[in-house]
């Protein structure tokens, strides 16, 4: 539920005032429910009631926002489900139809988009999860984004340059975006956030979403929380006319998926990218049978390295984000406990196979988000490991798994 403590972490006095007003308004409505009725409600019913009241407190906009999700993997489809549910419930804020761009594939002789639009399930990447009927799978990227006011990027980050190049000149000039991608744009000029890359290439303001969000659990509507970071642009049109924190909360918040909106885009982006390197170490620990104590040490050292990295390359990022937000330590714990990176690293340690081989065996066509290239050495262990969407203070070159873990633990 919305709390006073979280109001203090918003970006401006005006935002704080509005958040406090909405909180008081919602509290009054909750108090109006007779206790005899409230005590009979299940926990899920209470979450739904609170969710509905909070959403009603968001001011209607002049023109409802059209939302498009770019990406349809397991996480992309899950976020599309969340967004489409909210779009259907809030016609005063969003256009009911939500487009989800799908890279067209054939599954059992039928186009994946046709399956999604008729059976309302993504049978390849998110099977056995029912999707809202107002979620439309669209294989034409330009068609999917042309009228969108809010773009939600949720694709493997290595495809971002190609996608962005196709979007140039084909989106609204005043569109806003949220990136669910994990990683950095690294060049000779330095390190950039992927949200910054989107802003520079498309000329639109882009925030980020990250948190302790294993896609299958969110899709099954197990209770989860996440963090959305968005800094209001200089050309902000005003409340009711443009995307702000309240609109983003209404877009992503569900009774089973609680959202906190802040403005530290760098903080949650750094945490979301570098957690995967730490998860790699935890997977090797598990595969070698070193136990939970060693895994905890990897996570402790890893969190410290993440914070140092953030302070070095993005000095405006806030240390408290790593500790207080779902995108920080909570996401690190979740990813190191059961994410795809842990599974791949564990399998590598147990079998001596390359990352590519393990990905093919375990991930149904998806990537582990950690490697770009792994060469097999004569001993069977990776002879060159280069992080794909994040990196550490030391190169992973010609290291056995045990040496790699030792390197991770040195500070």
UniProtKB/Swiss-Prot annotation:
GO terms for molecular function: glycerol-3-phosphate dehydrogenase (NAD+) activity; NAD binding; protein homodimerization activity. The keyword Oxidoreductase applies. The keyword Oxidoreductase applies. NAD(+) binds at residues 71-76, 103, 159, 215, 340, 369. Its EC number is 1.1.1.8. GO terms for biological process: carbohydrate metabolic process; glycerol-3-phosphate catabolic process. SUPFAM superfamilies: 6-phosphogluconate dehydrogenase C-terminal domain-like, NAD(P)-binding Rossmann-fold domains. It holds the Pfam family NAD_Gly3P_dh_C. InterPro entries: 6-PGluconate_DH-like_C_sf (IPR008927), 6PGD_dom2 (IPR013328), G3P_DH_NAD-dep (IPR006168), G3P_DH_NAD-dep_C (IPR006109), G3P_DH_NAD-dep_euk (IPR017751), G3P_DH_NAD-dep_N (IPR011128), NAD(P)-bd_dom_sf (IPR036291). The active site is at 275 (proton acceptor). It catalyses: sn-glycerol 3-phosphate + NAD(+) = dihydroxyacetone phosphate + NADH + H(+). Keywords: NAD, Oxidoreductase. Substrate binds at residues 182, 340-341. GO terms for cellular component: cytosol; nucleus. Belongs to the NAD-dependent glycerol-3-phosphate dehydrogenase family. This is Glycerol-3-phosphate dehydrogenase [NAD(+)]. It comes from Lachancea thermotolerans. The lineage of its organism: Eukaryota, Fungi, Dikarya, Ascomycota, Saccharomycotina. The gene is GPD.
